[in-house]
Amino acid sequence: LLAGEVDALPIKGFDFGNSPWEIDQADLQDRELILRTTNGVVATLKAQDSKEVLVAGLVNAEATVNYLRQQNPPTVVLVASHPTGDEDVACAEYMRHLLGGEGVSYANARERTLNARAAKKFYDGTHPRLRPEDIEAAASSDGPGALIMRVRFDPIPCITAHPAPQD
């Protein structure tokens, strides 16, 4: 299956856009999904020399931070992959807050995500596959039980979802 977007718009001929709502409606059990995004994939590939790469958004930020606490790495680098998007910066700041540094609350990060410049096109109704539900999903949190998204690069870049470790 192919999923992806260019400047938030679904790619012609792909099975899905980068829509949490569309993906949530699909039966993906035992299916492989190839994802292409404007910024996230590029940022992930640039991090491939790191010891471990995790992908997070507000939906799995808390679970990802809990995983990082358990692993206790000497250094954590948070990358906001959208070059001008406040929603990615808000998520990184929220994760930094959860890690014990300066940052913002979940409520603040959620509000910034819902009101980000990039979110506006999901509310204006100009494209049938850009829905307000996608921004609501992106701004939601599944809490500590969310899936941890690990990236492996061998033999090819691949993100795999793992249950959050229990305390």
Positions of PLM-derived features:
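Residue-level preference for the first positions of well-ordered beta-strands
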Residues: 32, 75-77
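Short beta-strand segments
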Residues: 3, 35-37, 56, 79-81
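Glycine- and Gly-Pro-enriched alpha-helical subdomains that act as flexible
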Residues: 59, 63, 67-72, 84-103
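Long, charged alpha-helical interface segments
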Residues: 15-32, 36-38, 46-47, 51-52, ...
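Nuclease catalytic cores that cleave nucleic-acid phosphodiester bonds
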Residues: 25-26, 42-45, 54-69
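A short acidic, often aromatic-flanked loop/helix-cap motif at beta-alpha or helix-coil junctions
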Residues: 8-11, 61-63, 154-157
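Glycine-rich phosphate-binding loop signature in dinucleotide/nucleotide-binding domains
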Residues: 28, 71-74
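Residues that scaffold, gate, or flank divalent-cation-dependent active/transport sites
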Residues: 1-29, 41, 66
